[in-house]
Amino acid sequence: MQRSRASSTSSGRLQASQQVQPLDAPKIIVIHPGSQHLRIGRACDLNPLTMLHAVAYKRKHQEGDWPYHDPMLPSLDNINPAQLQVEFEEQRLIASRILQNCVIDDKQRLRVATPPQQLAHFNRKSVAEKIPPPGNLSEERNRQWLDRDAPVLFDEQILRLSTFDARDYDIHFPIQRGELNVHKQKGGSLQCTLQHIERIWSYALEARLKINLRDLRTHSAVLVVNDVYVRRHLREFMTLLLQRLGFQRCFLVQDSVASTYGAGIGFGCVVDIGAQKTSIACIEDGISQLNSRVRLQYGGGDINQVLLMLLRKCGFPYRECSVQDSYVDARLMDKLKERFCHLNAKVCGAQEKQFHLRKQNGQWLRYTLQVGDEAIMAPLAFFHTELLNITGKARKAFTQQPPQEQYDCEDCFDAEYLRETGRKNGARAADPIVAQLLAQPRPLPPITADDEELNVVDQDEPSSNGVAVHNTSSPSVGHAQKHFADTANGVYQYGQGQVMPLDQAVLEAIGRCATNETKRKMYGSILLVGSSVKIPGLAAWLQSCISQQVQPGTEVNVFTKGMDAGMVAWKGAAIMSVLESARELWITQVDWSRHGLRLLRERSPFLW
């Protein structure tokens, strides 16, 4: 396994303070946190434990204290609901015309769509049927469906909260849109968010994996992190694992790199579509290419909202569905997306579907409905992103800033620190490594602490090149910042101010690779991973869209691994953890307490 070249210092590289112990897979815990799910398990496990990455605290009813609920799905844009409906209908008609022009066989026959009005005629007459509990659930288990006396709820218990029950709890999802969910409301500070994560992970380790927290001092941890990361957050994760949870040692790995290990490939463009974000990165020899990384703010949850909007237009029989107020309904839409949606143009006409739902009184109901092009139009929003405007038009693309543009007051080898000390002591410039750091251009300081390591490309802000450039009174400083955004972080262009479609984002990411040979290799190995790539036909559709936009003769291959796509990164991290070459990546609890951030600079498997 190759790794990034760590930044050297005049004092040389750190030496491990302890003898490396033999690797023991049952003692290695692999953790892959996401916006909606947490995947955690031993490195020797066939599959990880997958649970909801959320926690619910029992409220103390006090005057003026209102319950706080993080939404499970992205919220609808409520600025102008009437205008939103009109615009959505316009885009639905455009997408419908695109589908009607699809050829479905060798005889050049076109698709035949079923109008929503015809489907609504059937669906409005559909009546829910009472059925016994599925899976022969016992009456005793039904009575224990929800433990209302528990002070803290996790996983399935949260998903069983009705709108009425949820009023007694504050519910937090500590990660949203791929990063820590830090906000200004109740329980939204950085330390509170880390406490939520500690609670969830402790529950998973103790209650589900049956590992006593006191025994973690004999266990190791591998944490899968995003390709586009905030260095301050990674530092907090290390402290959480080694000092608060008490693991003996740990190391971090980027999710796209872990995915290549899980898929068994040495290079490729990894497209990770999660519940609330889509990230793209080009991997070569185990290294994530800096300029190719991007995180887009849409995912499977946005597709759920599009699907619900489309189903309502054709008379969705479950009229009380409210994904914003009920986690039960939000989970239902997630299941309907997995069961109904596809990207197979040959499937057309009305299809009769059924789904089951448990009501608050314990009664199970079965709904029957007809679905037409709604099943293909919802995932088509990945490529016709105007449909995603219902969850907000103000979208941002995040790319990773180079190390010299990131600041950390606790890192004594930070580029900014070296500049400041170099001014006071000119003799330090004699060191060639320090001199190289001092010679790098200096960008403007960040606007906020939470986004200090992220370059934000916002299509709503006017800019000649698609990069949001902060207003400044100094033209030279503004030009320097623009230069950094253009050359180091990449520019993700948007058509008519619209969020970038999936195929265009992949083309842009691969286009930023250094050589034509690397680009050719990336086009030939596009790996789809993540919980939202299970839609049948998605890989073939993306491959067709990309093939039409590259030079003739370029081989394009989009594929998924023959396993649960959401587990590929976890499995890859488990494989990495037991490799002989990964021994030098481990950071022990003692070393972290003694050296801190310097260890990440020296040993992280990616450029710090």
Curated annotation (Swiss-Prot):
It is found in: Nucleus. Plays an important role in the functional organization of mitotic chromosomes. Exhibits low basal ATPase activity, and unable to polymerize. Proposed core component of the chromatin remodeling INO80 complex which is involved in transcriptional regulation, DNA replication and probably DNA repair. Strongly prefer nucleosomes and H3-H4 tetramers over H2A-H2B dimers, suggesting it may act as a nucleosome recognition module within the complex. GO terms for molecular function: ATP binding. This is Actin-related protein 8. GO terms for biological process: chromatin remodeling; DNA recombination; DNA repair; regulation of DNA-templated transcription. ATP binds at residues 272-275. Keywords: ATP-binding, DNA damage, DNA recombination, DNA repair, Nucleotide-binding, Nucleus, Transcription, Transcription regulation. Residues 1-20 are annotated as: Disordered. Component of the chromatin remodeling Ino80 complex. Exists as monomers and dimers, but the dimer is most probably the biologically relevant form required for stable interactions with histones that exploits the twofold symmetry of the nucleosome core. The keyword Nucleotide-binding applies. GO terms for cellular component: nucleus. Pfam families: Actin (PF00022). InterPro entries: Actin, ATPase_NBD. Belongs to the actin family. ARP8 subfamily.
